[in-house]
Amino acid sequence: MLKFTEEHEWLKVEGGVATVGITEHAAGQLGDLVFVELPEAGATFSKGDSAATVESVKAASDVYCPLDGEIVEINQAIVDDPSLVNSDPQGAAWFFKLKLADPRSADNLLDEAAYKELVG
């Protein structure tokens, strides 16, 4: 199940774990990324908490935790090479995997059609 947030994160939910990243729209708005900071595995976050930071030549931005949960894995590849986020934001450049406190909570997020309407 693919879901989106109004803060321009995408989630691919499988078996109570969500793979989370930023959308193509967000990556395009940020420009070329030069730095990515990810949370530690085992960290817990509530929906809306700042979970990661990205820096581009334009600005620094927070990446928010889309739902309550625990970080179970991070994508070290984007820390080592932040440009991956620009080249494949909704694929290989995922940020972290989040074990959802309530897997049904993802049902309340935007579907792809609603997200496309949001970004026009």
UniProtKB/Swiss-Prot annotation:
The modification N6-lipoyllysine is found at K58. The gene is gcvH. One of its GO terms (biological process) is glycine decarboxylation via glycine cleavage system. This is Glycine cleavage system H protein. The glycine cleavage system catalyzes the degradation of glycine. The H protein shuttles the methylamine group of glycine from the P protein to the T protein. Coiled coil: none annotated. CDD domains: GCS_H (cd06848). One of its GO terms (cellular component) is glycine cleavage complex. InterPro entries: 2-oxoA_DH_lipoyl-BS (IPR003016), Biotin_lipoyl (IPR000089), GCV_H (IPR002930), GCV_H/Fam206 (IPR033753), GCV_H_sub (IPR017453), Single_hybrid_motif (IPR011053). It comes from Sinorhizobium fredii (strain NBRC 101917 / NGR234).
